[in-house]
Amino acid sequence: MYKLICKDGNAKRGEFTTVHGKIQTPVFMNVGTAAAIKGAVSTMDLQEIGTQVELSNTYHLHVRPGDEVVKKLGGLHKFMVWDKPILTDSGGFQVFSLAGLRKIKEEGVYFNSHIDGKKIFMGPEESMRIQSNLASTIAMAFDECPPHPATREYMEDSVARTTRWLLRCKNEMNRLNTLEDTINKHQMLFGINQGGTYTDIRVEHAKRISELDLDGYALGGLAVGESHSEMYRIIEETVPYLPEAKPTYLMGVGTPANILEAVERGVDFFDCVYPARNGRHGHAYTNHGKMNLLNAKYELDDRPIEEGCGCPVCKNYSRGYIRHLLKAKEMLGLRFLVTHNLYFYNKMMEEIREAIENQNFASYKKKKLEGFAAEQGN
């Protein structure tokens, strides 16, 4: 259940109660595709850096180790030793990104595994069953992820199919939550709004799915090639047609600046691979933009990544040492950067929540964006 605590303009400060605890929103979910954060960051580390929600991938876990294996081992929470909320995506994005390897039918999608080429079928019911086996806190509906750009005709057909699939997801989720051997009988379902950059299609779809009284709603199919200004326009024009009394989730977005802009437009939930991916490439997020620790100027630098940062890495290690680890191709260097970056995102969300409560989000956002723009020679 979602409780709106307060608003500052369109920015919402809320609390989402789940069977695995309360989520303070706006929130950034830390992406652990195969039930682990890439970069050797454990769930113990996630607890220490203030992670509220972990996100795992249905498609990847279905292919390996298999959702039945995870179920036999007690579900994702027990499997990865994490007692806070977990959101699983539906697998749709991954399936539809296998463009040459898949075939869309009304019942679902036929595709080949990226691991061994084995033929797999996934439709709304299959996605719900897999996510039920994983026993995540929040399951995402199985939707078609249309290509960008797409013709209006294609988009209308695709969105209509996504709506039909959503109804099937809801019915199957309701059924699964009543079964005796279901691990999480309180699994929640979020629907996904699609429509590309066609505002009228997005708005009509938002109105339609809002009638279904789901636990939350996501904006899908963004950050797939459209400009940032187009993405912000779509968020601004679509969010008012989604229920304010439910959380809104912007899937796969994004940079710290993207998050600030989306919060201002009423978004509650975010996820993105950037903090971990950039960390694995030697980049650290700071309040003054991204820093490339591979840069030679940090060789003799005994300062932390960011002065005043409360993460366990900045409290203990220097830029010079981290640079050495990266140059020596030591896994520890990547782990340090991923840990710092996730902490940076989690801390920023904490500051955003505080700014909304104090009714000064606009000035907080302005100051933050000015800091990011000051990135020079990092």
UniProtKB/Swiss-Prot annotation:
E.C. number: 2.4.2.29
Record keywords, A-Z: Glycosyltransferase, Metal-binding, Queuosine biosynthesis, Transferase, tRNA processing, Zinc
Textual note on the cofactor: Binds 1 zinc ion per subunit.
Protein origin, superkingdom: Bacteria
Active site: residue positions: 89, 271
Xref: InterPro entries: ArchSynthase1/Queuine_TRR (IPR050076), TGT (IPR004803), TGT-like_sf (IPR036511), tRNA_ribo_trans-like (IPR002616)
Gene Ontology CC annotation, any one: cytosol
Biological processes per GO annotation: queuosine biosynthetic process; tRNA wobble guanine modification; tRNA-guanine transglycosylation
SUPFAM superfamilies found in the cross-reference section: tRNA-guanine transglycosylase
GO molecular function terms noted in the UniProt entry: metal ion binding; tRNA-guanosine(34) queuine transglycosylase activity
Region (RNA binding): 252-258, 276-280
Binding site for Zn(2+): 309, 311, 314, 340
Known cofactor(s): Zn(2+)
Tagged with keyword Zinc: yes
Pathway: tRNA modification; tRNA-queuosine biosynthesis
Reactions accelerated catalytically: 7-aminomethyl-7-carbaguanine + guanosine(34) in tRNA = 7-aminomethyl-7-carbaguanosine(34) in tRNA + guanine
Residues involved in substrate binding: 89-93, 143, 194, 221
Record's subunit section: Homodimer. Within each dimer, one monomer is responsible for RNA recognition and catalysis, while the other monomer binds to the replacement base PreQ1.
Family as reported in the entry's similarity comment: Belongs to the queuine tRNA-ribosyltransferase family.
Function recorded in the entry: Catalyzes the base-exchange of a guanine (G) residue with the queuine precursor 7-aminomethyl-7-deazaguanine (PreQ1) at position 34 (anticodon wobble position) in tRNAs with GU(N) anticodons (tRNA-Asp, -Asn, -His and -Tyr). Catalysis occurs through a double-displacement mechanism. The nucleophile active site attacks the C1' of nucleotide 34 to detach the guanine base from the RNA, forming a covalent enzyme-RNA intermediate. The proton acceptor active site deprotonates the incoming PreQ1, allowing a nucleophilic attack on the C1' of the ribose to form the product.
Protein name: Queuine tRNA-ribosyltransferase
Species for this entry: Lachnoclostridium phytofermentans (strain ATCC 700394 / DSM 18823 / ISDg)
UniProt lineage: Bacteria, Bacillati, Bacillota, Clostridia, Lachnospirales
